[in-house]
Amino acid sequence: MIQTESRLEVADNTGAREVMCIKVLGGSKRRYASVGDIIKVSVKDAAPRGRVKKGDIYNAVVVRTAKGVRRPDGSLIKFDGNAAVLLNTKLEPIGTRIFGPVTRELRTERFMKIVSLAPEVL
C-alpha cells in the first residue's frame, strides 16, 4: 500500500536507486496504490552515470509491496519491501532489465513488457 511520500526501491536498470511517491494517479481523492497501479514519483537517489538523475519526475508502476496482494483463491503474496519500475510518458518501461520478482497481477496489456523482462513471475 503506497501513499504520497512513500519511498520505493527501483526494480530496473535506469540508474535510479530510490524514488518517492508524489501522487497516486487515478482520481483526485485516491489515497493508496497497490501492485499494478501507476504513481508519479521523484528520483531521490541515483547512480552517477545512470539514465535518470536525482530530482527527475517520472511515472512508475508499483511491482512489489510489503502489504501484499490477495489472490481470488485466498493466498497472499507479500514482499520484503516496496518496489516500482519507471515509465516514460507513453507508460512504457524506461529500463531494459527488471530486477527481482513481479506478481501475476501485472499481466495486463499495458505491462506485458515488464512481465516478459522479469526474471520471476509469482
From Swiss-Prot:
Q: Cross-referenced Pfam families, in alphabetical order?
A: Ribosomal_L14
On whether Protease is a keyword of this UniProt record, the answer is no
SUPFAM superfamilies under this entry? Answer: Ribosomal protein L14
Q: What are the protein's GO molecular function terms? A: large ribosomal subunit rRNA binding; structural constituent of ribosome
Alphabetical GO biological process terms = translation
**Alphabetic keyword roster:** Ribonucleoprotein, Ribosomal protein, RNA-binding, rRNA-binding
**GO CC annotation, single:** cytosolic large ribosomal subunit
Q: Which PANTHER family match?
A: 50S/60S RIBOSOMAL PROTEIN L14/L23, LARGE RIBOSOMAL SUBUNIT PROTEIN UL14M
Report the family membership. Belongs to the universal ribosomal protein uL14 family.
Assembly and binders: Part of the 50S ribosomal subunit. Forms a cluster with proteins L3 and L19. In the 70S ribosome, L14 and L19 interact and together make contacts with the 16S rRNA in bridges B5 and B8.
Main role? Binds to 23S rRNA. Forms part of two intersubunit bridges in the 70S ribosome.
Indicate what this protein is called per its UniProt record. Answer: Large ribosomal subunit protein uL14
UniProt lists the gene as: rplN
